[in-house]
Amino acid sequence: DGSVTYTPNDNYHGADSFTYIVTSGGVSESTMVNIDVTPVNDAPVATNDNAVTDEDTPVTIDVLPNDTDIDGDTLSIQSASVPSDQGTVEIVDGKLVFTPAENFHGDAEITYTVTDGSLTDQATVNVTVNAVNDTPVVESSLADQTLAEDFTPYSIDLNTAFSDVDNVDGELTFSVSGNSNVLVSIENGIATISPTADWNGSEALTFTAADPSGESVSQTVNFTVAPVAD
């Protein structure tokens, strides 16, 4: 139809020209066309990142160095988010600070948006959170015991007195120390307390819970056995 279509190269802007030739009746004439290609802002390109941290340990992630903008615009982080069960993320001094949720370990995925001040792009950061062994804790305090001489044997459930977020019931090992006359046997976390015949007095018993890694916690219970007339 006699029209000419000019298409600049990708992302080119500036001066350009082309020459076209018109032929009529065997006579040709060339004409140069000057073109000014005005710049148009291009969106930045955000690139995915990876990071590693330990359980309960915040990590600072510099995500911008591998993000690009062909126009040379200065990039910044506009926003960032992470599922709440995995942790929290903040933007601090142009970097992401990820704090894992308490006792969380595994893979966390942060989504962030980078901007050149006008246009944006999104990328993700995969954070590998390494598991760290947690020490068992005292879940409930064992009360001091006041008993009568030759008391009837009874039991204390150590599974409810101690807990470990890393281990389910049955994975803690229980022990007792400090007893000579208050007899204790422990099976499946149940401590059976028995008397020594005709004994009375006081003893401080220390119950200890240890996890498979050897980390442990203890609590002491004072046993007082009152004399009874025979």
Positions of the model-derived regions?
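Strand-loop-strand motifs at the edges of beta-sheets in extracellular beta-sandwich domains
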Residues: 1-10, 18-19, 82-102, 109-111, ...
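Extracellular ectodomain surface segments
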Residues: 9, 29, 42-83, 101, ...
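Calcium-coordinating acidic loop motifs
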Residues: 12, 104, 117, 199, ...
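Short, solvent-exposed loop/turn segments enriched in Ser/Thr/Gly
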Residues: 13-18, 57-62, 105-111, 151-157, ...
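A structural signal for beta-strand boundary/capping segments at domain termini and interdomain linkers
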Residues: 15, 28-30, 107, 120-122, ...
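Short, solvent-exposed loop/turn segments at the edges of extracellular beta-sandwich modules
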Residues: 22-27, 114-119, 209-215
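Feature 14080 marks short, conserved micro-sites in well-ordered regions
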Residues: 35, 127
